[in-house]
Amino acid sequence: MELLEEDLTCPICCSLFDDPRVLPCSHNFCKKCLEGILEGSVRNSLWRPAPFKCPTCRKETSATGINSLQVNYSLKGIVEKYNKIKISPKMPVCKGHLGQPLNIFCLTDMQLICGICATRGEHTKHVFCSIEDAYAQERDAFESLFQSFETWRRGDALSRLDTLETSKRKSLQLLTKDSDKVKEFFEKLQHTLDQKKNEILSDFETMKLAVMQAYDPEINKLNTILQEQRMAFNIAEAFKDVSEPIVFLQQMQEFREKIKVIKETPLPPSNLPASPLMKNFDTSQWEDIKLVDVDKLSLPQDTGTFISKIPWSFYKLFLLILLLGLVIVFGPTMFLEWSLFDDLATWKGCLSNFSSYLTKTADFIEQSVFYWEQVTDGFFIFNERFKNFTLVVLNNVAEFVCKYKLL
């Protein structure tokens, strides 16, 4: 075809001949191309028109007008036939028999075949018909098949896709919300619980991953089915208006096969089970757990109250020890002074000093008792508040560990 096109091309405009005219030298050119050359020759000549020369061989021709040149009807007809052949679709060939055109339609297998397939191949005993009859029959079949496929399970697939995406979104929202609760709860605990907090948050992330692993494959399957369905629609839209029988039958075969594959693909379920933890998670269930037993618990156990109380007798004993300590500190000094002096004046001085010591000691003890009472009162208040706060934290953490079997 390329070599033929070279012979049908005008040397001047390099396009297919348009109204070809033959010169006396037998060279062919388009009429418009010759008119352009002749017009330029006349314009450049001031006195008389110069002789017209062939653009190929430069042989002179009398410039009596282009219309006087003979039309090459043979070349013009060849160009017209070439244009028709170039525009018409190329005849498809058989894949099994090289170079054989697909010019027969097998009604048994509903596909295009060649003559060898019909006489010596696997279609020997099948029923055949002409391309025109097959085109008319398949054209009617296409309309009904297209209408039935247009609404085939598309609504069901879209509904299931929406259900799965909604379920996935809600599940992830629940897990995210629960994860935030755990983060807020563990932020109030001591640093010794950080490792346990990270383990629990890791469990939530694992559950998120499990949800995504459960939902994503099904969602991807539905997206693939819908994408295949859209591709089938695009194929149908592309060739439903095709009037060429061969091209239509070939496209119809591909369309039927794609529809068959789509219909045979099962739709995944839309009611995947959710984890019970996503529905029943509540941090209030941690309130009865003991923090002291966090590292020991693996199953829920009876909850109780952690009691830490300092008896009042301890404070009485502390005061007695303090008084005895004062006597021990000041007693040896007074005893030494008594043993060193024998006269009465010395004893009187010692007694006077002892009396002074007793007075100072009594004042000191009185002030010590007063400040100690203030300290113990403040300590009792702080102890009660700290005890209540500690009990709440201990019970909550122990309940959480028992419930979720973290150990």
Swiss-Prot record:
Zinc finger (RING-type): 10-58
Keyword set, alphabetical order: Coiled coil, Endoplasmic reticulum, Immunity, Innate immunity, Membrane, Metal-binding, Transferase, Transmembrane, Transmembrane helix, Ubl conjugation, Ubl conjugation pathway, Zinc, Zinc-finger
Residues binding Zn(2+), per UniProt: 94, 97, 117, 123
Keyword NAD carried by entry: no
Ranges in coiled-coil conformation: 172-200
One of the record's GO cellular component terms: endoplasmic reticulum quality control compartment
Catalytic function, reaction form: S-ubiquitinyl-[E2 ubiquitin-conjugating enzyme]-L-cysteine + [acceptor protein]-L-lysine = [E2 ubiquitin-conjugating enzyme]-L-cysteine + N(6)-ubiquitinyl-[acceptor protein]-L-lysine
CDD domains tied to this protein: Bbox2_TRIM13_C-XI, RING-HC_TRIM13_C-V
Pfam families with a match to the protein in the record: zf-B_box, zf-RING_UBOX
Topological relation to the membrane, as annotated: Single-pass membrane protein
Domain of life: Eukaryota
UniProt main location, coarse: endoplasmic reticulum
Record PTM text: Auto-ubiquitinated; requires the RING-type zinc finger. Auto-polyubiquitination leads to proteasomal degradation.
Enzyme Commission no: 2.3.2.27
Zinc finger region(s), B box-type: 89-131
GO MF entry, a single one: ubiquitin protein ligase activity
Pathway involvement of the protein, from the record: Protein modification; protein ubiquitination
Comment block on domains: The coiled-coil domain is required for the induction of autophagy during endoplasmic reticulum (ER) stress.
Subunit structure, as described in the record: Interacts (via C-terminal domain) with VCP. Interacts with AKT1; the interaction ubiquitinates AKT1 and leads to its proteasomal degradation. Interacts with MDM2; the interaction ubiquitinates AKT1 and leads to its proteasomal degradation. Interacts with p62/SQSTM1. Interacts with TRAF6. Interacts with IKBKG/NEMO.
UniProt miscellaneous comment: Located on chromosome 13 within the minimal deletion region for B-cell chronic lymphocytic leukemia.
Protein name in UniProt: E3 ubiquitin-protein ligase TRIM13
Organism per entry: Homo sapiens (Human)
